[in-house]
Amino acid sequence: MASTGLTNIQEKTTCPVCQELLTKALSLGCGHRVCQACLITKKNAVINPREKSSCPVCGTRFSLENLQANKHLANVVERLGEVKLKPDIGTKRDLCVHHGEKLLLFCKEDKKAICWVCERSQEHRGHHTFLWEEAVRECQENLQKALTRLRKEQEKVETLEADIKEDRLSWKCQVQTERQRIQTGFNQLRRILDKEEQRELKRLREEEQMILDSLAGAEAELAQQSQLVEELISDLELRREWSDTELLQDMSGILKWSQIWTLKKPKAVSKKLSMVFQAPDLSGMLQKFRELTAVRAYWDNFTFNPENLNLNLILSEDHRQVTSVSIWPFKCCNNGILGSKCFSSGKHYWEVDVSEKKAWTLGVYTRKRTLRFDVRQRKGQPNGYHRYKPQNGYWVIGLQHGSKYSIFEDSSNCDPTVLNPFVATPLHRVGVFLDCEEGTVSFLNVTNHGSLIYKFSQCCFSQPAYPYFNPWDCPAPMTLCPLNS
């Protein structure tokens, strides 16, 4: 392609008269280009510029005064002349400097081009030689392979760079999440400690007020006795001034009263506090907090199920709160309501606010057999608690009469075995943790930092398990706590 282009340029820059590169090229009206000297020296050239002459190539007549020098073509001719000054450079490069033969072979050991004479020389005897074209082709193939491999490596580098960027973002997100988790955890611990501090200070204030009230009462009583004694003393001193007759006539009464009067000592008040503050077990609190945080990871957000709602139960607009109302003249003993979700596998957790209620029951229920209960409690009919047994599909705890906490276990008779656990902190918020695979139902005192209330083990969930709630006839609301509340 390059040689063809060069040939075309040479044709356009060659004078058709002298067959040499154009010198002071002139462009004729017919389009041909000739040297100025060739045009003037032609036998048909005319000295008088007003006369007409003809093109030496095609014979077209033209006036000499209209001729113009082609400067662009002159520049091209000048550059082409520089190239033609060394016409044998490319040829010499293809010839052996020692023998003048064409370099048609390639020596693998010396890695250079050689001619056929070099191949037979002592210098290259025993060397591996190939045709120049084959060596070039092999070299190009090797270059292509290397290029392909490097491009693949480059792609790997780009992929690794992208992975590193992604890892950096991922780590930043993980670190940020962990930072927030740590800050949240310690903020919660600080709130717990603040709450414990306020509770201890409140207890101390109450004890202080009780002791001060007792001391104030004792002080008032002593003041009364002191006043009475002063009056008696004053009366006796006054009587000493009386006459003998007056003294003897009225002496028996005042003496008798003075003799029988004795000081009534006030009730002794302890000089020591009933309870000395002890720093809370931070490790135990932290462990309970960690356990609570762990189960809260399985929080299920659901509502009360409005289907088949008993007439004496009223749901809030968002179905997260249930309230019991009385239906005269009947007293309901089956106020149960289920959650809007059921569970057959996995781990699930929810929390219930019962802070205002004096009676409630909550936990997990699964259908084991058909149980029929009359919503009207007639005379002689057992109360609604007798059905709360695991063998009937109930794993529940509850509160009765505002202070009696109950856990309902299986028994050999109709009524369940009722356990009454000691609860140091009243249950205002209860957490329920269901583990279907382990077959356990755990109840946590969220009010007391997540301490365990009770855990049912070896639970059999042959049917889907439902969250269960019973507000009883207590009018205070029972509320499902929203996530992260």
Curated annotation (Swiss-Prot):
Residues binding Zn(2+): C96, H99, C118, H124
Pathway given in the UniProt record: Protein modification; protein ubiquitination
Transmembrane segments: none
Gene Ontology MF terms in the entry: transferase activity; zinc ion binding
Catalytic activity line of the entry: S-ubiquitinyl-[E2 ubiquitin-conjugating enzyme]-L-cysteine + [acceptor protein]-L-lysine = [E2 ubiquitin-conjugating enzyme]-L-cysteine + N(6)-ubiquitinyl-[acceptor protein]-L-lysine
PROSITE patterns registered for this protein in UniProt: B302_SPRY, ZF_BBOX, ZF_RING_1, ZF_RING_2
Keyword NADP included in the entry's annotation: no
Chain segments annotated as coiled-coil in the UniProt record: 136-170
Alphabetical UniProt keywords: Antiviral defense, Coiled coil, Cytoplasm, Metal-binding, Mitochondrion, Transferase, Zinc, Zinc-finger
Signal peptide coordinates: none
Cellular component per GO, a single term: mitochondrion
Major site of localization recorded for this protein: cytoplasm
Entry-linked InterPro entries: B30.2/SPRY (IPR001870), B30.2/SPRY_sf (IPR043136), Butyrophylin_SPRY (IPR003879), ConA-like_dom_sf (IPR013320), SPRY_dom (IPR003877), TRIM/RBCC (IPR050143), TRIM34_PRY/SPRY (IPR035826), Znf-RING_euk (IPR027370)
Zinc finger (B box-type): 91-132
All residue ranges annotated as the B30.2/SPRY domain in the record: 282-485
Superkingdom field: Eukaryota
Knocked-out gene: effects: Trim34a- and TRIM34b-deficient mice show an impaired integrity of the inner mucus layer.
Zinc finger (RING-type): 15-59
GO biological-process terms attached to the record: defense response to virus; protein ubiquitination
Keyword Zinc attached: yes
PANTHER family per record: E3 UBIQUITIN-PROTEIN LIGASE TRIM (PTHR24103)
Family membership: Belongs to the TRIM/RBCC family.
Record's subunit section: Homotrimer. Interacts (via B-box and SPRY domain) with TRIM5.
Protein name: E3 ubiquitin-protein ligase TRIM34A
Annotated source species: Mus musculus (Mouse)
